[in-house]
Amino acid sequence: YAIDKDIKLFDRIREVFNSKLIVLDKDDIKPSNVKPIFIVGMPRSGTSLVHQIIGSHNKVYGAGELNQLNQFVVPFLKNYDPIKGFIKEDLLKVRNQYLQYIDSLNVNEKIVIDKMPLNFRHIGFMISAFPEAKIIHMNRDPMATCWSIYKYYFNGNGYSYDQNDLANYYHLYKKLLAFWRQLFPNKIFDLYYEDLTNDQEKQTQNLLKYCELEWDENCLKFYQNETAVRTTSALQVKQKIYKGSSDVWKKYEDYLQPL
């Protein structure tokens, strides 16, 4: 793993959105059959748990971790021309490709969750291309997050195998989130994993209110939801919420100095 590649990617993302800020409005888009809810954050930050909670609502379909947004955005980033800049047609292309894929899922629900954690890189595209979307960013204690990533060795995430790489990537992530918050104030719903585990009902109420969903008791019984979960967190989200998981790393503190 070489972090230089990710540094260049994150720099390119900031370059695109620093050049000219464009956001689609209602006059630019056709009415969509579905409204996306994007759940993002670092892996092991609680995205699967929130997916399972909201996905237990009777009006919501939990689609899991979809790679489509990344597939549609990355070619644009690679071919970005600073002279031409960033235009509405670029956003419309990403929007239409993504919504066509969501339509192809053929689900009855009008609200669809996409919980690809690393889509935090594309929050700018979410806000700009999907003005109707809801964006939930999961926060968790940094050491708890990084220890959990390191413990489970995420396939495909090269930074997870080395503590120094992991720490450096985490700093890239935090820097980009600060950029998004400054660029799009009040557009991202920040949820803290520790708050959710300490007061599930209150935080679930806040979540549903943000998503413009009425209360559904099923969201408190998310562990009974039979929807398949295909992540490392699959077993955990089939159980009731438990407290204290963010402190487990402390038992290994002496071995986690690079973090």
Predicted regions mapped to residue ranges:
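PAPS-dependent sulfotransferases, especially Golgi type II membrane carbohydrate sulfotransferases
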Residues: 1-36, 82-110, 149-190, 198-259
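Short hydrophobic/aromatic residue motifs in ordered secondary structure
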Residues: 15, 49-50, 144
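Phosphate-binding active sites in nucleotide-utilizing proteins
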Residues: 19, 26-130, 134, 138-139
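A secondary-structure boundary/capping signal
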Residues: 65, 192-193
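Conserved nucleotide-binding/hydrolysis micro-motifs of P-loop NTPases
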Residues: 67-69, 140-145, 196-198
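Acidic, metal-coordinating catalytic cores used for nucleic-acid/nucleotide bond scission
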Residues: 117-119, 195-199
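Short N-terminal helix/helix-N-cap motif within the alpha/beta-hydrolase-1
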Residues: 121-124, 147, 201
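Conserved P-loop NTPase nucleotide-binding/switch module
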Residues: 126-130, 136-160
